[in-house]
Amino acid sequence: MKMRIAALAIGALFAVLTGATAWAADKDAAPPPVSTDPQTTSASYGDWILNCVRSQDGSSRVCEIVQTFQIQGQQGPFARLAIGHVGAKDPLRATFDVAPNISFPSTVKLALDDKDTQPVELTWKKCVPGAGCFADAELKEDVLKRWKAQTGNGRITMKDSTGHDVAVPFSFRGLPQALDGLAKS
């Protein structure tokens, strides 16, 4: 019994000393300098927000335009539609992420309205606990041209976990200006 208590005491002392050494090393390390350029920026264009984030070393920026969706009476968004480039030379992609309440196999459709015969189909890529389920697709130039000409609401459709179709309206208001801002970023 005494050996067990001694072993526990030695283990506790080791943990304290190890933690103190790590804390001292962290305390002595200088934080990186702060850039004169902002690390993150955002600009609103109607119902769309252009978000840009600078890399840690300041050598590049990643930007996307976003529209979030919130259920009345609930805190925080339940879904998000984002448009951006994965890499600087890559084509524009639309990404939809939503809380995990979906059916497989299924797709997400982005349409001008309920009569649109050429909706953009986004393929589910992954579901991440605590983050949501993600679907995406490349946006072709003809689709962007049609979307820029719209003034009302589009329609996002998907299947929920019970297999029922769910429709969520999204806004085209400010999309042309947001896409122009994205192109300049």
Roles of regions detected by a PLM:
Residues M1-I10:
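Bacterial N-terminal signal peptides that target proteins for export
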Residues F14-W23:
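C-terminal segment of classical bacterial N-terminal signal peptides
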Residues W23-S185:
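A generic "folded-domain core" signal
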